């Protein structure tokens, strides 16, 4: 049997390194997540980072669980950022769930719909880069 905490820790580290490779931004695990509720899993050293990241690694499934999305929403609401769930199931690629509003803002628009976009990891990195660029230009 796999230790779920170790599996989560390893996935958070994998994502931390992948984000650095793609975006050049440093992330660290938020160790307070075990002591306090409504915190994300990874913290970015860049204060303009627009997301609270929740990482989930599970054996089977095909989409993010509602509880994960709610957890990310609560954490994001507390710090006025966009929620983001980065998840992976065995034998499937990493996927990322973000609000339509984040995608719209990255493309120069707005969106009030509560819908979520499910992106590839690289698609998410594109949106994050564009969103940070749009905000820096304001």
Where do the model's predicted regions map?
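Catalytic phosphate/metal-binding cores of nucleic-acid and nucleotide-processing enzymes, i.e., regions
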Residues: 1-138
């Amino acid at each position: 049997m796999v230790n779920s905490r170790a599996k989560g820790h390893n996935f958070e580290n994998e994502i931390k390194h992948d984000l650095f490779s793609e975006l050049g931004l440093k992330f660290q695990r938020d160790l307070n997540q075990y002591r306090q509720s409504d915190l994300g899993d990874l913290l970015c050293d860049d204060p303009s980072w627009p997301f609270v990241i929740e990482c989930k690694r599970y054996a089977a499934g095909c989409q993010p669980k509602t509880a994960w999305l709610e957890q990310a929403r609560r954490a994001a609401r507390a710090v006025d950022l966009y929620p983001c769930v980065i998840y992976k199931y065995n034998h499937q690629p990493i996927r990322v769930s973000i609000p339509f509003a984040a995608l719209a803002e990255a493309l120069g628009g707005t969106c009030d719909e509560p819908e979520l976009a499910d992106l590839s990891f690289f698609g998410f990195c594109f949106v994050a880069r564009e969103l940070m660029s749009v905000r820096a230009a304001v």
